[in-house]
Amino acid sequence: MSAVGLPLWRQHAHALWQLSKPRVVALIVFCAVIGMFLASPGVPDAAVVVPATLGIALVAGAAAMVNCLVERGVDVRMRRTAWRATATGEVGARETLLVALAVGGMGLALLLACCNALTAWLTLGTFVGYAIVYTLLLKPNTPQNIVIGGASGAMPPVLGWTAVNGQIDAFALALFLIIYTWTPPHFWALALYRRDDYARAGLPMLPVTHGQRYTTLSIVLYGFLLTAVTLLPVALGEAGAIYLGAVLLLDGRLLFLAVRLHRQYADALARRLFAWSIWYLTWLFAALLLDHYYLIPLN
């Protein structure tokens, strides 16, 4: 959404809002909320769900702002990110940092006051893992950046889970592993059709360092691994026929696109796989939620 034509203060507020990567935060919050509902045999208490959702969203937005701040020099060299306010100079480094710290601090305070210390500490760890470890240390230095750094992005359902019951169970770890395994092929698909952008910016993404063929093969292999990991909720007895049917269809489609991409590469196919992977995760977690309340046993 363009902010052109708005008063200057609203344009500035819009620029700050965009630095928080609202679309990414929306998916993070969605997975966290699903984790909250899965952690409860009934409907979780709204007095926990509302502040937990807001707290996680605020910290996620703050982490995204720090990411944009740290990468402003890189963003200038990439067509995909050159418009960001930190790259154009519309929002200064000091202001970005202060707003991020204020927003993140409010989120953590909310989690500590209305949820529990475990969730607050895990959320802080996730912030540090993404904004500092991934952004500063991993992304500019290793093609395995997304494999190692993906742990931070896989935390939302665990944060939602602990917000409700204050502990980490096997099912919560299974949710973590699903997103952790999903993350590399999701981002590698993006990096494939944006490889020139990443090369121009000097970022060692897998398609830049190892080439297209190696990357598409890696996507296929991770696709098969993801298929196995998504069966964990069934193996743990936490999901039934609804989820199993959904996950077989979703994994089948993902593998079909991955294999096709490997056999006859085209940027358009990589784009399609990237877009599908977002819907894949959304529908998979929606199926988990539906199955949770309308469980159809497999035996």
From Swiss-Prot:
It catalyses: heme b + (2E,6E)-farnesyl diphosphate + H2O = Fe(II)-heme o + diphosphate. InterPro entries: Protohaem_IX_farnesylTrfase, UbiA_prenyltransferase, UbiA_sf. Its main location: membrane. It comes from Chromobacterium violaceum (strain ATCC 12472 / DSM 30191 / JCM 1249 / CCUG 213 / NBRC 12614 / NCIMB 9131 / NCTC 9757 / MK). It is a multi-pass membrane protein. Its EC number is 2.5.1.141. Belongs to the UbiA prenyltransferase family. Protoheme IX farnesyltransferase subfamily. GO terms for biological process: heme O biosynthetic process. The gene is ctaB1. PANTHER family: 4-HYDROXYBENZOATE SOLANESYLTRANSFERASE, PROTOHEME IX FARNESYLTRANSFERASE, MITOCHONDRIAL. This is Protoheme IX farnesyltransferase 1. CDD domains: PT_UbiA_Cox10. Pathway: Porphyrin-containing compound metabolism; heme O biosynthesis; heme O from protoheme: step 1/1.
